[in-house]
Design a protein with these regions (language model features):
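Active-site HxH/HxHxD metal-binding segment of metal-dependent hydrolases
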Residues: 52-143
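Conserved beta-strand hairpin/beta-sheet module of binuclear metal-dependent hydrolase folds
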Residues: 9-62
C-alpha cells in the first residue's frame, strides 16, 4: 500500500462559523485525535496538535494565519505532536513536566505509536525513531 504524503495527511471540517475540526484520517479511530481550531476576535485557539509526524503548521494553513494559543488537553503523544510549532502553549499544571520533556514512556508512545495505529502509513514513518519534540508551556492551567 502506498504511504500517505504530507500534503494529504490532514483533513479539516468546518463545524460552525468559527470552529474547525482538524484530524488525521489515516489514523485508526481508536488512536485518532480530534484537533479543534476556534477563530477568536484577537487570536485563535488550537486545542491539541495530533501525532506530529508531519508539520501541522506547514500543511494546515488555517493554524498559521493569525496569532494562536495552543492548548494541550492532555499529554498523550497523539495530542501534543506539533505543540513545539507554536510559541504560545498552555497545559494543566499536572502535565507541564511531560510537555517540556515528552519521553515516549510518559506520553504512552512507547506502547501505542506503532504501525498498527494506522489505516495507511505516513511517508517516512519509522516507529522505532518516533519522538515528540519538547514544547514547554508558557502558561499553566489549573482547575476552576
Amino acid at each position: 500500500m502506498t504511504p500517505i504524503a504530507a500534503k494529504d495527511w490532514y483533513e479539516t471540517i468546518r463545524m460552525a462559523d468559527a470552529v474547525t475540526l482538524i484530524h488525521e484520517p489515516w489514523i485508526k479511530p481508536f488512536f485518532r485525535c480530534n484537533m479543534w481550531h476556534v477563530r477568536g476576535r484577537d487570536r485563535d485557539l488550537l486545542f491539541d496538535t495530533g501525532l506530529g509526524h508531519f508539520s501541522l503548521r506547514r500543511h494546515v494553513r488555517l493554524v498559521a494565519e493569525r496569532p494562536l494559543l495552543c492548548v494541550a488537553s492532555h499529554t498523550h503523544f497523539d495530542h501534543i505532536g506539533c505543540h513545539h510549532e507554536f510559541p504560545e502553549r498552555c497545559v494543566h499544571t499536572a502535565e507541564a513536566e511531560i510537555l517540556a520533556d515528552p519521553r515516549n514512556e510518559w506520553t504512552v508512545a512507547d506502547r501505542y505509536a506503532t504501525d498498527e495505529m494506522f489505516d495507511r502509513l505516513p511517508e517516512g514513518w519509522d516507529a522505532s525513531r518516533y519522538r515528540i519534540r519538547p514544547a514547554p508551556a508558557q502558561r499553566l492551567l489549573a482547575h476552576g
